[in-house]
Structures are given as C-alpha cells and as structure tokens.
Amino acid sequence: MTPRADGRPTSHHVRVRDLRLHYLDFGGDGPPLLFLHATGFHAWVWAPYAEHFRATHRVLALDQRGHGESDKPPSGYRWEEFGADLMRFLDALALDRVHVVGHSKGATAIAAAAAAGTERLARAVLIEPVLFAGPLASAPIRESPLAVGAGRRREVWPSRAAMFDSLRPRMPFETWQEEFVRCYVDHGVADRPDGQVVLRCPGAIEAEIYAHAPMTDGFALLERLHVPVLLIGGERSPGLGEREAAEALRRLPAGTLLTVPGAGHFVPMERPREVMEAIARFLAEPRAPTRPT
C-alpha cells in the first residue's frame, strides 16, 4: 500500500471468531510491521512510530480485545487469549513474514501468539514484556495493587482538554514526550451524549488483565518464539531488571538485548528516538542476530 497523502491511517474492523477487532492501517511500502500496545492503551499511541516507519514498511496497529474500538467481552483476558487473538488476526488478514513490535502486555502477546502456533512472524521487538515465572497463581489475583488501582481509575472527564491537563503532570505521563500523551488522550476516550468523554478501556477490564497476568509463565512463552528477537528495556524499569533480562535472553532462541539509559517501563514514549533507531537497525539486519561471546 502507498501512504495516504495526509498521513492519517485508515480504520478497519476484522472479525476474529466471536470478536470484532479494530486496527489502523497507516499505509507504507514494504513488509508488514504491526504494533501492539500495552494494557490500557490503544493503537493510536503508535502513530509517531508509524510516521517514522511507513517509508520502509506497511505499518499497522491493533486495538487488542478490551481496548480502543475493539470489542470488550466480559472475560478472556489471560495472556493466552491475547496471543490467540493475534494469531487469528494475522490469519484473517493473511499477513506473512510480519515484523511485530509490542510494548508490555503487547510484547507478551507476541510470545503467546508464537506459543499458540503462529508461523507468520519474521522478527519481533519485545519492549518491556510482562514476565512472570513460578510459582504461578491458580486463579486471578484481584486484590493485587495493580488490579485494585485499575479498578478505581477515573473513567470520565468533562473534555479531552481537561483529561490532558489532569494526566500530563502525573505518572506515568509526566515522563512521556507530549505527542504520545496527546495521542493517548485524543483517541483513548469516546464522546458521551452529555458532552463528556469516557475511557475506551474501562477500568474493570484493565483490572481483569492485571489480575490474570500472574497465571501465565511469560518466560516459558519466550521459548516458543523461534524468530530473531530484540528485547528492549528501560534502565530504571522495575519489571525488566538485570535478572529478568538475563533469564529472558536465556529462554529466547535468538534474542539480543538493548537497555535504554535513564528510561523506565514506558521507554517507547519516553525515549522514542532511541527506540525507533534501535528498531530500524534490527529490522534492517540481513541475518538473525547472534549472541555476543
């Protein structure tokens, strides 16, 4: 596909079994490059990345179940479900040799899709994947701090401008480049009849995702990802520390690591230039990367 003259993506829905999944097609020439967002976000947060990469790739971004303009079923929020959705999405669009980039939950969903059996991936970039190892939970942990906090999240604002002003000085948004905050706000809410705006990803769904996360061994999923993988972490991230990164590299059949100095879990929004450059170098490699000796 060729890029639209105005640079805006086209909006589409595709049926994946009993779900309607929404995605953005930014156009571009070259192999497909698909972006997957983190919990609570949406496809539009990748718009600055799409602008960068559509000179070399056909860029798409997916609203995962429960997010954005995709369906929001009351259940089905384990990592395995997100992985199965991704596999079926690629099948529905008949995309092959796909380069895929995921952040946080989106990164883990890529590994889960590989574990589900997809063979449509060419390369994968996992940015701050969510990785749990044993002992795993046998049931959702709804009293976890993340789940409880998400369940209490404010969902309604008088306007997008009021939402931006409220969120911009707070974590995690205070460390983001401003264009990413505006993408999150502008497209992360829907208009209500009373003139207010409401989150497209309800707090209850976000809470369900966090509650189910400790039920899956994310490190085991990595072992099924038999394509070249670039693992990106933020130096200040509490989730992907040295121990977790080393274990992830041990499990990945063909993985390399980049740690971005001074960045945290939201490194793609905090340090986009460094992340874009790293992704571009990785996607341009002619052969699978080799581990340093």
In which residue ranges do the predicted regions lie?
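Helix-rich cap/lid subdomain of alpha/beta-hydrolase
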Residues: 134-197, 210
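Conserved acidic catalytic loop of the alpha/beta-hydrolase fold
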Residues: 83-98
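Conserved hydrolase catalytic core segment
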Residues: 52, 96-139
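Alpha/beta-hydrolase fold catalytic core
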Residues: 1-35, 55-57, 95-96, 280-293
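The conserved beta1-alpha1 loop
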Residues: 36-38, 103, 233
